[in-house]
């Protein structure tokens, strides 16, 4: 049975003692990292979230404490009182390596079984074990550093927004389901049988209502929920830094957030963010990088060869151009000697993105080698090489297809090759704003337009008339902040005119009745003088991944779910009592085979 503290107070953390503390009598508390018994002396490394310090117990120091210390094992939770002294053999690998604690008294606060995982940095254990014993995984120093980074990030964000006149305000977690986009998590109501709340995918509508309410600068750090198929770095619940401002335009939101990003990255990670951050229209991002989340740490931009081969009789090029598509290519330097098997793998790769194939031209010292050379005239080959600014050693990779297929396949191939060739500078942080997104996309299956972001996004002023004539060409006052090929956050200016908002719902295929059924409270609010407003939200978890230097989102969330949205620690979701279901008016239906 563990000993009680009985008024004993911790006076210093394990990672704090330095030479200026020599001679002080202190009490430390923490977990035993390891113990070494050298006969007349016992050394214990004691750990807490600030670091590790060495404690020495000896018969000459205190016989009772010495004998008691021999009983401790790894992960025992103990308290030790003694004097800080200069260490005879300093350990330069430890922050506290110049000193040690002479253990004069020890309390064993609780014992520990042998842990199923090692509590050390760089743990090599299965994800399932780490999640099942997450409370042990979180003791590891590298994990604790991550959550100190997370805490500091939130503090810097709060301080910055407070200094800039923002109010931290909460919005509801139990809200109304407005199915548009990802699936909602639904919560049955006991008071209203057969009816459900939804957990918010974002605070979007409520923060707009706060603007109508006159709270012109709002923010919160909040949980959001999406019941979607999980990819590698997605979680069913995630944290968002959310903000909204009134009486502003795009430039105001962007300028404020550039200053916020510069402050966060400098104060938390010592990273300088060059301001102003580059802005790139969506159209340019797709044409040059094949992605609305371009990684700018390396070149290999996409080039348009359509003009160069517009008169070609090569049926692959000709067919793509006649169908309204294009012929585009990327250039991989020093890859002309790439073997046929490697190129075949690249062809298989682009086919996963619906490309029909991958043409290639290898610019070698003594020849230009290509399986399509026989289908091209000398002038066409020369035009391609000139357009690509090709040099000896270059490998040109070409896709001819519909534009969306060309962009997606070459964009993915560009990233794939950059990783394979190891040409990405992992120490570089390249930010870019992507602007002028399409407002809408057409859903062929449903026969209607869908909002690319959400139905409250404002249109670019010069495109308003296109909403009646050609909705697919309308651009949005939307902006995403991208870092090293990952979306860090995104936002937009919102529609604040009730008639325009109703018109938008109509374009999206909502009847007036349906729009009022789902969003009536917002449309009603817009009758009462809504201000021009807009905002932005960051994925906090993804931001911490960059600041902490980890590629796994589960590392930055205290108790994450696994790839199947299951928690190995608590075993949630779980079967609930039939009485609970009955109280909610819910009956389980057994699935037929």
UniProtKB/Swiss-Prot annotation:
List of residues binding L-aspartate: 180, 226, 453, 494
EC number(s) reported in the record: 6.1.1.12
GO function term, MF aspect, one: nucleic acid binding
Keyword Repeat: no
Region feature Aspartate, mapped onto this chain: 204-207
Subcellular location: Cytoplasm
GO cellular component terms, A-Z: cytoplasm
Keywords: Aminoacyl-tRNA synthetase, ATP-binding, Cytoplasm, Ligase, Nucleotide-binding, Protein biosynthesis
Keyword Protein biosynthesis: yes
UniProt-listed Pfam families: GAD, tRNA-synt_2, tRNA_anti-codon
GO biological process, one term: aspartyl-tRNA aminoacylation
Residues reported in the UniProt entry to bind ATP: 226-228, 235, 487, 539-542
Catalytic reaction equation(s): tRNA(Asp) + L-aspartate + ATP = L-aspartyl-tRNA(Asp) + AMP + diphosphate
Family (UniProt): Belongs to the class-II aminoacyl-tRNA synthetase family. Type 1 subfamily.
Subunit structure: Homodimer.
Function according to Swiss-Prot or TrEMBL: Catalyzes the attachment of L-aspartate to tRNA(Asp) in a two-step reaction: L-aspartate is first activated by ATP to form Asp-AMP and then transferred to the acceptor end of tRNA(Asp).
Protein name per Swiss-Prot or TrEMBL: Aspartate--tRNA ligase
